[in-house]
Curated annotation (Swiss-Prot):
Binding site for ATP: P121, T122, G123, S124, G125, K126, T127, L128
InterPro entries, per database record: AAA+_ATPase, ATP-dep_Clp_protease_ClpX, ATPase_AAA_core, Clp_ATPase_C, Clp_protease_ATP-bd_su_ClpX, ClpX_bact, P-loop_NTPase, Znf_CppX_C4
Gene3D superfamilies: 1.10.8.60, ClpX chaperone, C4-type zinc finger domain (6.20.220.10), P-loop containing nucleotide triphosphate hydrolases (3.40.50.300)
Coiled-coil ranges from the UniProt annotation: none
Subunit structure of this chain's protein: Component of the ClpX-ClpP complex. Forms a hexameric ring that, in the presence of ATP, binds to fourteen ClpP subunits assembled into a disk-like structure with a central cavity, resembling the structure of eukaryotic proteasomes.
Family that this chain belongs to: Belongs to the ClpX chaperone family.
GO biological process: cell division; proteolysis involved in protein catabolic process
Entry protein name: ATP-dependent Clp protease ATP-binding subunit ClpX
Taxonomic lineage: Bacteria, Pseudomonadati, Pseudomonadota, Gammaproteobacteria, Alteromonadales
HAMAP family: ClpX (MF_00175)
GO cellular component labels: HslUV protease complex
Amino acid sequence: MGDNKNNGDSGKLLYCSFCGKSQHEVRKLIAGPSVYVCDECVELCNDIIREEIKEISPKRDHDKLPTPHELRNHLDEYVIGQDKAKKVLAVAVYNHYKRLRNGTTKEGVELGKSNILLIGPTGSGKTLLAETLARSLNVPFAMADATTLTEAGYVGEDVENIIQKLLQKCDYDVEKAQRGIVYIDEIDKISRKSDNPSITRDVSGEGVQQALLKLIEGTVASVPPQGGRKHPQQEFLQVDTSKILFICGGAFAGLEKVIEQRAHTGTGIGFGAEVKGEQDKATISQILGQVEPEDLVKYGLIPEFIGRLPVVATLTELDESALIQILSQPKNALTKQYGALFEMENVELEFREDALKAIAKKAMSRKTGARGLRSIVEGILLDTMYDLPTVKGVVKAVIDESVVKGESDPILIYENNDTKAASGEQ
Protein backbone atom coordinates (compact mmCIF):
# COMPACT_ATOMS: atom_id res chain seq x y z
CA MET A 1 0.00 0.00 0.00
CA GLY A 2 3.06 2.25 0.35
CA ASP A 3 3.22 2.73 -3.43
CA ASN A 4 -0.43 3.81 -3.53
CA LYS A 5 0.15 6.51 -0.95
CA ASN A 6 3.19 7.85 -2.85
CA ASN A 7 1.11 8.05 -6.03
CA GLY A 8 -1.47 10.11 -4.15
CA ASP A 9 1.17 12.47 -2.78
CA SER A 10 2.59 13.08 -6.29
CA GLY A 11 -0.82 14.00 -7.72
CA LYS A 12 -1.39 10.69 -9.46
CA LEU A 13 -4.11 8.11 -8.79
CA LEU A 14 -5.26 7.78 -5.18
CA TYR A 15 -6.11 4.38 -3.70
CA CYS A 16 -8.17 3.30 -0.67
CA SER A 17 -5.77 2.15 2.05
CA PHE A 18 -8.23 -0.62 3.10
CA CYS A 19 -9.59 -2.25 -0.08
CA GLY A 20 -7.05 -0.95 -2.61
CA LYS A 21 -9.63 0.45 -5.06
CA SER A 22 -8.62 3.54 -7.02
CA GLN A 23 -10.45 6.86 -6.84
CA HIS A 24 -12.08 6.06 -10.21
CA GLU A 25 -13.59 2.81 -8.90
CA VAL A 26 -15.43 4.42 -5.97
CA ARG A 27 -17.78 7.38 -5.52
CA LYS A 28 -15.79 9.12 -2.79
CA LEU A 29 -12.27 8.85 -1.40
CA ILE A 30 -11.70 10.49 2.00
CA ALA A 31 -8.14 11.62 2.79
CA GLY A 32 -6.50 11.40 6.21
CA PRO A 33 -2.91 11.70 7.51
CA SER A 34 -1.06 9.46 5.01
CA VAL A 35 -4.19 7.29 4.59
CA TYR A 36 -7.28 7.16 2.33
CA VAL A 37 -10.66 5.45 2.86
CA CYS A 38 -13.41 4.99 0.26
CA ASP A 39 -17.18 5.34 0.76
CA GLU A 40 -17.65 1.55 0.35
CA CYS A 41 -15.31 0.78 3.25
CA VAL A 42 -17.05 3.42 5.41
CA GLU A 43 -20.43 1.77 4.69
CA LEU A 44 -18.97 -1.66 5.49
CA CYS A 45 -17.72 -0.38 8.86
CA ASN A 46 -21.17 1.05 9.59
CA ASP A 47 -22.76 -2.34 8.83
CA ILE A 48 -20.35 -4.11 11.20
CA ILE A 49 -21.15 -1.65 14.01
CA ARG A 50 -24.91 -1.99 13.39
CA GLU A 51 -24.68 -5.79 13.61
CA GLU A 52 -22.82 -5.56 16.93
CA ILE A 53 -25.46 -3.20 18.32
CA LYS A 54 -28.19 -5.67 17.23
CA GLU A 55 -26.48 -8.46 19.15
CA ILE A 56 -26.30 -6.37 22.31
CA SER A 57 -29.84 -4.92 22.12
CA PRO A 58 -31.84 -8.15 22.66
CA LYS A 59 -29.94 -8.87 25.86
CA ARG A 60 -30.82 -5.44 27.21
CA ASP A 61 -34.48 -5.89 26.24
CA HIS A 62 -34.44 -9.35 27.81
CA ASP A 63 -33.41 -7.84 31.16
CA LYS A 64 -36.47 -5.58 31.17
CA LEU A 65 -39.37 -8.01 31.47
CA PRO A 66 -42.78 -6.26 31.40
CA THR A 67 -45.14 -7.15 34.26
CA PRO A 68 -48.54 -8.77 33.53
CA HIS A 69 -50.18 -5.36 34.09
CA GLU A 70 -47.84 -3.72 31.56
CA LEU A 71 -48.46 -6.51 29.03
CA ARG A 72 -52.22 -6.15 29.51
CA ASN A 73 -52.03 -2.36 29.07
CA HIS A 74 -50.07 -2.83 25.84
CA LEU A 75 -52.69 -5.29 24.56
CA ASP A 76 -55.44 -2.78 25.42
CA GLU A 77 -53.82 -0.24 23.08
CA TYR A 78 -54.22 -2.52 20.05
CA VAL A 79 -56.97 -5.04 20.88
CA ILE A 80 -60.55 -4.18 21.89
CA GLY A 81 -62.38 -6.37 24.43
CA GLN A 82 -61.38 -9.96 25.34
CA ASP A 83 -60.46 -8.90 28.91
CA LYS A 84 -60.32 -12.44 30.35
CA ALA A 85 -58.16 -13.73 27.48
CA LYS A 86 -55.79 -10.76 27.85
CA LYS A 87 -55.29 -11.48 31.55
CA VAL A 88 -54.65 -15.20 30.93
CA LEU A 89 -52.18 -14.40 28.14
CA ALA A 90 -50.36 -11.70 30.13
CA VAL A 91 -49.76 -14.04 33.08
CA ALA A 92 -48.76 -17.02 30.91
CA VAL A 93 -46.33 -14.99 28.80
CA TYR A 94 -44.83 -13.30 31.87
CA ASN A 95 -44.27 -16.68 33.56
CA HIS A 96 -42.74 -18.14 30.39
CA TYR A 97 -40.11 -15.41 30.03
CA LYS A 98 -39.51 -15.37 33.78
CA ARG A 99 -38.72 -19.09 33.47
CA LEU A 100 -36.25 -18.38 30.67
CA ARG A 101 -34.49 -15.72 32.74
CA ASN A 102 -34.18 -17.72 35.93
CA GLY A 103 -34.09 -21.37 34.81
CA THR A 104 -34.42 -23.49 37.95
CA THR A 105 -35.34 -22.18 41.41
CA LYS A 106 -32.97 -22.04 44.40
CA GLU A 107 -34.41 -25.38 45.53
CA GLY A 108 -33.56 -26.89 42.14
CA VAL A 109 -37.19 -27.04 40.98
CA GLU A 110 -37.42 -27.03 37.18
CA LEU A 111 -40.23 -24.84 35.88
CA GLY A 112 -42.45 -26.47 33.26
CA LYS A 113 -43.28 -24.91 29.91
CA SER A 114 -46.75 -23.42 29.53
CA ASN A 115 -47.83 -23.16 25.91
CA ILE A 116 -51.19 -21.55 25.19
CA LEU A 117 -54.39 -22.60 23.41
CA LEU A 118 -56.74 -19.83 22.21
CA ILE A 119 -60.34 -20.79 21.47
CA GLY A 120 -62.56 -18.25 19.75
CA PRO A 121 -64.56 -17.50 16.59
CA THR A 122 -63.06 -16.14 13.37
CA GLY A 123 -62.10 -12.48 13.61
CA SER A 124 -62.16 -12.33 17.42
CA GLY A 125 -58.50 -11.27 17.70
CA LYS A 126 -56.52 -14.48 18.33
CA THR A 127 -53.73 -13.72 15.86
CA LEU A 128 -53.60 -10.04 16.80
CA LEU A 129 -53.20 -10.87 20.50
CA ALA A 130 -50.25 -13.18 19.82
CA GLU A 131 -48.61 -10.74 17.40
CA THR A 132 -49.04 -7.78 19.77
CA LEU A 133 -47.48 -9.72 22.65
CA ALA A 134 -44.41 -10.54 20.55
CA ARG A 135 -44.09 -6.89 19.54
CA SER A 136 -44.36 -5.66 23.13
CA LEU A 137 -41.61 -8.08 24.21
CA ASN A 138 -39.45 -7.31 21.14
CA VAL A 139 -39.07 -10.99 20.26
CA PRO A 140 -39.32 -12.68 16.83
CA PHE A 141 -42.82 -13.77 15.79
CA ALA A 142 -43.77 -16.39 13.22
CA MET A 143 -47.18 -17.62 12.15
CA ALA A 144 -48.11 -20.97 10.63
CA ASP A 145 -51.34 -22.45 9.32
CA ALA A 146 -51.99 -25.92 10.73
CA THR A 147 -54.00 -26.91 7.64
CA THR A 148 -50.87 -26.74 5.45
CA LEU A 149 -48.84 -29.03 7.72
CA THR A 150 -48.35 -32.74 7.07
CA GLU A 151 -46.27 -35.52 8.54
CA ALA A 152 -42.66 -35.73 7.40
CA GLY A 153 -42.36 -37.61 4.12
CA TYR A 154 -45.73 -36.49 2.74
CA VAL A 155 -46.53 -33.71 0.29
CA GLY A 156 -47.01 -30.53 2.28
CA GLU A 157 -45.20 -28.48 4.88
CA ASP A 158 -43.14 -30.21 7.58
CA VAL A 159 -43.57 -28.97 11.15
CA GLU A 160 -39.86 -28.02 11.19
CA ASN A 161 -40.67 -25.36 8.59
CA ILE A 162 -42.29 -23.39 11.41
CA ILE A 163 -38.88 -22.97 13.05
CA GLN A 164 -37.42 -22.05 9.66
CA LYS A 165 -39.94 -19.17 9.44
CA LEU A 166 -38.99 -17.99 12.93
CA LEU A 167 -35.28 -18.00 12.01
CA GLN A 168 -36.00 -16.01 8.86
CA LYS A 169 -37.70 -13.32 10.98
CA CYS A 170 -34.49 -12.76 12.98
CA ASP A 171 -31.88 -13.19 10.21
CA TYR A 172 -31.03 -16.73 11.34
CA ASP A 173 -29.93 -15.59 14.81
CA VAL A 174 -30.49 -18.86 16.73
CA GLU A 175 -30.23 -17.25 20.19
CA LYS A 176 -32.87 -14.69 19.28
CA ALA A 177 -35.14 -17.28 17.64
CA GLN A 178 -35.07 -19.40 20.79
CA ARG A 179 -36.79 -16.56 22.67
CA GLY A 180 -39.46 -16.10 19.99
CA ILE A 181 -43.20 -16.70 19.81
CA VAL A 182 -44.86 -19.02 17.28
CA TYR A 183 -48.58 -18.80 16.54
CA ILE A 184 -50.19 -21.83 14.88
CA ASP A 185 -53.61 -20.95 13.48
CA GLU A 186 -56.51 -23.28 12.55
CA ILE A 187 -55.31 -25.85 15.09
CA ASP A 188 -58.86 -27.24 15.32
CA LYS A 189 -58.64 -28.30 11.66
CA ILE A 190 -56.07 -31.00 12.51
CA SER A 191 -58.43 -32.75 14.92
CA ARG A 192 -58.83 -36.49 14.55
CA LYS A 193 -61.62 -37.29 12.11
CA SER A 194 -63.32 -39.68 14.57
CA ASP A 195 -63.04 -40.93 18.15
CA ASN A 196 -61.71 -44.28 16.96
CA PRO A 197 -58.16 -44.51 15.54
CA SER A 198 -58.30 -45.22 11.82
CA ILE A 199 -56.45 -47.97 9.99
CA THR A 200 -55.51 -45.53 7.21
CA ARG A 201 -52.95 -42.76 7.76
CA ASP A 202 -54.38 -39.36 8.71
CA VAL A 203 -51.42 -37.28 7.48
CA SER A 204 -53.08 -33.89 8.00
CA GLY A 205 -54.93 -34.64 11.25
CA GLU A 206 -53.73 -36.85 14.08
CA GLY A 207 -50.43 -37.36 12.26
CA VAL A 208 -49.69 -33.63 12.41
CA GLN A 209 -50.60 -33.54 16.10
CA GLN A 210 -48.05 -36.30 16.71
CA ALA A 211 -45.44 -34.41 14.68
CA LEU A 212 -46.07 -31.19 16.62
CA LEU A 213 -45.82 -32.87 20.03
CA LYS A 214 -42.06 -32.79 20.50
CA LEU A 215 -41.66 -29.46 18.76
CA ILE A 216 -44.10 -27.76 21.14
CA GLU A 217 -42.91 -29.55 24.27
CA GLY A 218 -39.25 -28.90 23.55
CA THR A 219 -36.69 -30.57 21.32
CA VAL A 220 -33.55 -29.64 19.42
CA ALA A 221 -34.72 -29.08 15.85
CA SER A 222 -32.23 -29.27 12.99
CA VAL A 223 -32.92 -26.50 10.50
CA PRO A 224 -30.95 -25.85 7.29
CA PRO A 225 -29.07 -22.53 7.42
CA GLN A 226 -29.81 -19.58 5.16
CA GLY A 227 -29.22 -20.74 1.60
CA GLY A 228 -28.90 -24.31 2.87
CA ARG A 229 -29.98 -25.82 -0.45
CA LYS A 230 -27.28 -23.94 -2.32
CA HIS A 231 -24.63 -24.96 0.19
CA PRO A 232 -25.51 -28.51 1.31
CA GLN A 233 -22.11 -28.91 2.95
CA GLN A 234 -23.06 -26.37 5.64
CA GLU A 235 -24.00 -27.75 9.03
CA PHE A 236 -27.65 -27.58 10.12
CA LEU A 237 -28.61 -25.01 12.74
CA GLN A 238 -29.61 -26.52 16.08
CA VAL A 239 -32.60 -24.74 17.64
CA ASP A 240 -33.82 -25.58 21.16
CA THR A 241 -37.61 -25.27 20.97
CA SER A 242 -38.08 -25.63 24.75
CA LYS A 243 -37.49 -21.87 25.02
CA ILE A 244 -39.94 -20.94 22.25
CA LEU A 245 -43.48 -20.03 23.31
CA PHE A 246 -46.12 -21.75 21.17
CA ILE A 247 -49.60 -20.27 20.96
CA CYS A 248 -52.19 -22.35 19.11
CA GLY A 249 -55.54 -20.94 18.04
CA GLY A 250 -58.74 -22.13 16.43
CA ALA A 251 -62.46 -21.45 16.13
CA PHE A 252 -63.45 -24.96 17.33
CA ALA A 253 -66.90 -24.73 15.75
CA GLY A 254 -69.30 -27.08 17.53
CA LEU A 255 -67.15 -27.45 20.66
CA GLU A 256 -69.89 -25.83 22.75
CA LYS A 257 -72.16 -28.78 21.91
CA VAL A 258 -69.53 -31.22 23.19
CA ILE A 259 -69.22 -29.24 26.44
CA GLU A 260 -73.01 -28.97 26.68
CA GLN A 261 -73.41 -32.72 26.34
CA ARG A 262 -70.87 -33.34 29.10
CA ALA A 263 -72.18 -30.74 31.54
CA HIS A 264 -75.90 -31.17 30.72
CA THR A 265 -76.32 -27.40 30.82
CA GLY A 266 -77.88 -27.06 27.39
CA THR A 267 -81.39 -25.86 26.67
CA GLY A 268 -82.20 -28.80 24.41
CA ILE A 269 -80.84 -32.28 23.87
CA GLY A 270 -77.14 -31.58 23.52
CA PHE A 271 -76.14 -32.04 19.90
CA GLY A 272 -79.73 -31.61 18.77
CA ALA A 273 -80.14 -28.20 20.39
CA GLU A 274 -80.34 -25.25 18.01
CA VAL A 275 -78.66 -21.91 18.64
CA LYS A 276 -80.99 -18.95 18.22
CA GLY A 277 -80.88 -15.25 18.99
CA GLU A 278 -78.44 -12.94 20.74
CA GLN A 279 -79.05 -14.46 24.17
CA ASP A 280 -77.89 -17.91 23.01
CA LYS A 281 -74.77 -16.39 21.42
CA ALA A 282 -73.76 -15.06 24.82
CA THR A 283 -74.46 -18.50 26.27
CA ILE A 284 -72.07 -20.10 23.75
CA SER A 285 -69.23 -17.88 25.04
CA GLN A 286 -70.07 -18.87 28.61
CA ILE A 287 -70.13 -22.56 27.68
CA LEU A 288 -66.75 -22.34 25.89
CA GLY A 289 -65.35 -20.80 29.08
CA GLN A 290 -66.11 -24.11 30.84
CA VAL A 291 -64.03 -26.20 28.43
CA GLU A 292 -62.16 -29.15 29.93
CA PRO A 293 -59.38 -31.31 28.41
CA GLU A 294 -61.83 -34.20 27.97
CA ASP A 295 -64.00 -31.99 25.74
CA LEU A 296 -61.03 -31.27 23.48
CA VAL A 297 -60.25 -35.01 23.34
CA LYS A 298 -63.81 -35.73 22.24
CA TYR A 299 -63.52 -32.94 19.67
CA GLY A 300 -60.55 -34.72 18.10
CA LEU A 301 -57.32 -33.54 19.74
CA ILE A 302 -55.17 -36.33 21.16
CA PRO A 303 -54.56 -36.24 24.96
CA GLU A 304 -50.78 -35.87 24.58
CA PHE A 305 -51.23 -32.79 22.40
CA ILE A 306 -53.68 -31.18 24.83
CA GLY A 307 -51.19 -31.83 27.63
CA ARG A 308 -48.62 -29.66 25.81
CA LEU A 309 -51.09 -26.72 25.86
CA PRO A 310 -51.94 -26.34 29.57
CA VAL A 311 -53.02 -22.68 29.40
CA VAL A 312 -56.42 -22.25 27.72
CA ALA A 313 -58.02 -18.87 26.99
CA THR A 314 -61.42 -18.45 25.36
CA LEU A 315 -62.36 -15.41 23.28
CA THR A 316 -65.90 -14.13 22.87
CA GLU A 317 -67.58 -13.23 19.59
CA LEU A 318 -67.33 -9.50 18.92
CA ASP A 319 -70.62 -7.59 18.95
CA GLU A 320 -71.51 -4.50 16.94
CA SER A 321 -70.32 -2.00 19.55
CA ALA A 322 -66.94 -3.77 19.81
CA LEU A 323 -66.52 -3.62 16.02
CA ILE A 324 -67.26 0.13 16.07
CA GLN A 325 -64.55 0.57 18.72
CA ILE A 326 -62.11 -1.54 16.68
CA LEU A 327 -62.67 0.76 13.70
CA SER A 328 -61.69 3.92 15.56
CA GLN A 329 -60.05 3.40 18.97
CA PRO A 330 -56.89 1.18 18.83
CA LYS A 331 -53.51 2.66 17.92
CA ASN A 332 -53.63 0.94 14.54
CA ALA A 333 -57.38 1.41 13.99
CA LEU A 334 -58.47 1.12 10.35
CA THR A 335 -59.85 4.67 10.26
CA LYS A 336 -56.46 5.94 11.47
CA GLN A 337 -54.57 3.84 8.92
CA TYR A 338 -56.65 5.08 5.98
CA GLY A 339 -56.58 8.58 7.46
CA ALA A 340 -52.78 8.44 7.30
CA LEU A 341 -52.92 7.33 3.64
CA PHE A 342 -55.20 10.26 2.76
CA GLU A 343 -52.98 12.63 4.76
CA MET A 344 -50.12 11.74 2.41
CA GLU A 345 -52.26 13.35 -0.32
CA ASN A 346 -52.87 16.37 2.00
CA VAL A 347 -56.51 15.32 2.39
CA GLU A 348 -58.37 14.84 5.68
CA LEU A 349 -60.52 11.69 5.91
CA GLU A 350 -63.61 11.75 8.12
CA PHE A 351 -65.79 8.77 9.03
CA ARG A 352 -69.09 9.86 10.53
CA GLU A 353 -70.59 7.88 13.41
CA ASP A 354 -73.43 6.49 11.28
CA ALA A 355 -70.83 5.23 8.77
CA LEU A 356 -68.96 3.31 11.49
CA LYS A 357 -72.23 1.70 12.63
CA ALA A 358 -73.10 0.72 9.05
CA ILE A 359 -69.65 -0.84 8.52
CA ALA A 360 -69.98 -2.80 11.78
CA LYS A 361 -73.44 -4.06 10.77
CA LYS A 362 -72.11 -5.19 7.40
CA ALA A 363 -69.25 -7.09 9.11
CA MET A 364 -71.74 -8.71 11.51
CA SER A 365 -73.89 -9.90 8.60
CA ARG A 366 -70.82 -11.46 6.95
CA LYS A 367 -69.93 -13.26 10.22
CA THR A 368 -66.22 -12.55 9.74
CA GLY A 369 -65.69 -10.49 12.91
CA ALA A 370 -62.96 -7.86 12.86
CA ARG A 371 -61.21 -9.68 10.00
CA GLY A 372 -63.85 -8.50 7.52
CA LEU A 373 -63.62 -4.81 8.42
CA ARG A 374 -60.62 -4.01 6.21
CA SER A 375 -62.16 -5.42 3.02
CA ILE A 376 -65.35 -3.41 3.66
CA VAL A 377 -63.46 -0.14 4.23
CA GLU A 378 -61.20 -0.84 1.23
CA GLY A 379 -64.24 -1.32 -0.98
CA ILE A 380 -65.80 1.94 0.23
CA LEU A 381 -62.66 4.00 -0.41
CA LEU A 382 -61.37 2.27 -3.57
CA ASP A 383 -62.72 4.73 -6.17
CA THR A 384 -61.77 7.75 -4.06
CA MET A 385 -58.20 6.49 -3.58
CA TYR A 386 -58.00 5.81 -7.33
CA ASP A 387 -59.10 9.34 -8.32
CA LEU A 388 -57.64 11.42 -5.50
CA PRO A 389 -54.03 11.75 -6.79
CA THR A 390 -55.33 13.29 -10.05
CA VAL A 391 -58.01 15.55 -8.53
CA LYS A 392 -56.76 19.02 -7.56
CA GLY A 393 -57.80 21.13 -4.59
CA VAL A 394 -59.45 18.46 -2.40
CA VAL A 395 -58.90 19.09 1.33
CA LYS A 396 -61.36 16.66 2.91
CA ALA A 397 -63.26 13.44 2.16
CA VAL A 398 -66.32 12.53 4.23
CA ILE A 399 -67.82 9.03 4.57
CA ASP A 400 -71.36 8.67 5.90
CA GLU A 401 -73.92 5.86 6.14
CA SER A 402 -75.22 6.34 2.59
CA VAL A 403 -71.68 5.82 1.21
CA VAL A 404 -71.31 2.53 3.12
CA LYS A 405 -74.68 1.33 1.82
CA GLY A 406 -73.65 2.22 -1.74
CA GLU A 407 -76.38 4.84 -2.12
CA SER A 408 -73.96 7.74 -2.74
CA ASP A 409 -70.28 8.55 -3.30
CA PRO A 410 -67.93 9.99 -0.66
CA ILE A 411 -68.31 13.76 -0.19
CA LEU A 412 -65.25 15.74 -1.33
CA ILE A 413 -64.64 19.21 0.10
CA TYR A 414 -62.41 21.59 -1.90
CA GLU A 415 -60.18 24.50 -0.93
CA ASN A 416 -62.87 27.04 -1.89
CA ASN A 417 -65.37 25.20 0.41
CA ASP A 418 -67.09 23.74 -2.65
CA THR A 419 -68.62 20.33 -1.91
CA LYS A 420 -69.09 17.58 -4.50
CA ALA A 421 -69.59 13.84 -4.61
CA ALA A 422 -66.42 11.91 -5.46
CA SER A 423 -67.74 10.69 -8.81
CA GLY A 424 -68.38 14.28 -9.90
CA GLU A 425 -64.65 14.86 -10.48
CA GLN A 426 -62.39 12.90 -12.78
